[in-house]
Swiss-Prot record:
<comment type="similarity">
    <text>Belongs to the heme-containing dehydratase family.</text>
</comment>
<dbReference type="GO" id="GO:0046872">
    <property type="term" value="F:metal ion binding"/>
</dbReference>
<feature type="binding site" description="axial binding residue">
    <location>
        <position position="299"/>
    </location>
    <ligand>
        <name>heme b</name>
    </ligand>
</feature>
<comment type="function">
    <text>Catalyzes the dehydration of aldoximes to their corresponding nitrile. Is active toward various arylalkyl- and alkyl-aldoximes, and to a lesser extent toward aryl-aldoximes.</text>
</comment>
<keyword id="KW-0479">Metal-binding</keyword>
<feature type="binding site">
    <location>
        <position position="219"/>
    </location>
    <ligand>
        <name>an aliphatic aldoxime</name>
    </ligand>
</feature>
<dbReference type="Pfam" id="PF13816">
    <property type="entry name" value="Dehydratase_hem"/>
</dbReference>
<keyword id="KW-0349">Heme</keyword>
<comment type="subunit">
    <text>Homodimer.</text>
</comment>
<dbReference type="GO" id="GO:0016829">
    <property type="term" value="F:lyase activity"/>
</dbReference>
<feature type="active site">
    <location>
        <position position="320"/>
    </location>
</feature>
<protein>
    <recommendedName>
        <fullName>Aliphatic aldoxime dehydratase</fullName>
        <ecNumber>4.8.1.2</ecNumber>
    </recommendedName>
</protein>
<dbReference type="InterPro" id="IPR025702">
    <property type="entry name" value="OXD"/>
</dbReference>
<keyword id="KW-0456">Lyase</keyword>
<keyword id="KW-0408">Iron</keyword>
<feature type="binding site">
    <location>
        <position position="320"/>
    </location>
    <ligand>
        <name>an aliphatic aldoxime</name>
    </ligand>
</feature>
Amino acid sequence: MESAIGEHLQCPRTLTRRVPDTYTPPFPMWVGRADDTLHQVVMGYLGVQFRGEDQRPAALRAMRDIVAGFDLPDGPAHHDLTHHIDNQGYENLIVVGYWKDVSSQHRWSTSPPVSSWWESEDRLSDGLGFFREIVAPRAEQFETLYAFQDDLPGVGAVMDGVSGEINEHGYWGSMRERFPISQTDWMQASGELRVVAGDPAVGGRVVVRGHDNIALIRSGQDWADAEADERSLYLDEILPTLQSGMDFLRDNGPAVGCYSNRFVRNIDIDGNFLDLSYNIGHWASLDQLERWSESHPTHLRIFTTFFRVAEGLSKLRLYHEVSVFDAADQLYEYINCHPGTGMLRDAVITAEH
């Protein structure tokens, strides 16, 4: 049994765990492992927003342009494509890229082909919305959890490998305790979302500044290779409850501290749906994410179902990754997106702006 925290990230713990040292988890789970050369990763969520079938071809072309840019020097080591319909009826094509270090992502994003595309006046006049939500957690600021050991998705795809069975799972509070930084830091949030350029009500280009310790969760489901019984388990038993919880967070986020929630379906380059999905949730703080997870009926039902079936899972792949960030390691930028998009909804326009 291993700790979820890599040996090179372990230090004397000043904050106590929720379980005793003798705790044994009820079933096996694993985490992504990276060596001490990985200091900080970058997660880039690059979106194209549209409404109506007449805009779909142009939106798909724009998505393909973004993906083509990943082939340039310093492009991400891993990416995937997703689709989301928000509660205003807009469709969003989201290209998600992962970089193993900040410098390569910076070189990529500032290269002339990429920066000129994003900064072009065409982005303001082509009838689509665009956004980029880019965050860069340090190695001690993110955790992963997988019910499988191969072909890790998300940030796991840019790590070196996978752990043995880990100890920190199967109890409330284990998510926090998989963060290396949790050994000595409560990861308390401070500040608020602020609009620092533009006006969401007007449109055009809008930039939102984040605050310390915003939390981002990506929680995924892969039923592509599942047999009939596991497909039924997911589609008939897990998905309805999951969808209910995700819709609640999408529509009632401010009441519980959730800035943005998108339950997305993976797609291919032509926009066809794949049998994979995940949730993208931005939270005002990790403790607010914890409170919702531990108390809301929909999540409690999901958690109970997972506990019941986890040990017998074969080809239904379930996982999550959670991260927090310093304010300086976040960028939220929107072009002609509706004011309820992403971090725009809860961002405050200050007097000095």
